[in-house]
Amino acid sequence: MERLAAAITESLIKKADYYIDLHGGDDYEELTPYVYFAGVAKPEIVEASRKMAEQVDVPYMVQSNVSTGGAYNYAASTCDIPAVLLERGCMGTWEREEVDSMRRDVRNILCSIGAYNGIRSHSTYYPLKMDDVRYQCASVNGLWYPVKKPGDIVHQDEYLGEIRDYEGNVKEICRADMDGVILYQVSSLQVVEGGPVITYGNIVREKDERKTRIAQYWTRRSDSFLEQRRAELHSALAGRWMTELKKHLPVSGRFRILR
């Protein structure tokens, strides 16, 4: 195994300019889509990794605070290669939409770094940054009963779930150490001592230059936006939709497009 790892490192990783790792969660985990970017590396490598993460259509991006524990972290910290890890899909299942989203994310990243001349998505994504992530593990063997779902917002000391024994006795209560958003948690009933239970991160409250760009964008559009929307509502396409919708309404019903 060590020889295989060495061969992959020398023949592939060290010859790469960028590193994109695609993950789908373990069979026993449910998660909300998010992306990691390398955070323990030279400043220019961290910044390049972050810019890659900003191309991904997910709600959250997590700045990794370790240099090991993943090939993408090794690539950035040891080989000076900007790196990200995408998490989408979970519990050993997949959907066509998830596959298409992952392909679109990879294409957008490749376009952003100049490695692909294809058509990038016209959308601009704004994943919220997290750099304080808590990985809570079980202190006992038992059965896990969560009360939250991935993507839920939690507050410090909030009850997240409990671990019981086979007789139903509560052996451990899990509470949030801080405010945050649940990224993933164990979806299986059984958990083992020292094994993962739930993970959540705190959204960074920092000045984000992207917010300024958003405000400027909508400021430029504000003067003509209402006029444009009204024109669209009175277009030929809107008229065809009205005709189709009226076919399915009661005869006495009234229907109009609000504007």
Q: Where are the regions that the model predicts?
A:
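Structured catalytic-domain cores with a bias toward divalent-metal coordination
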Residues: M1-R259
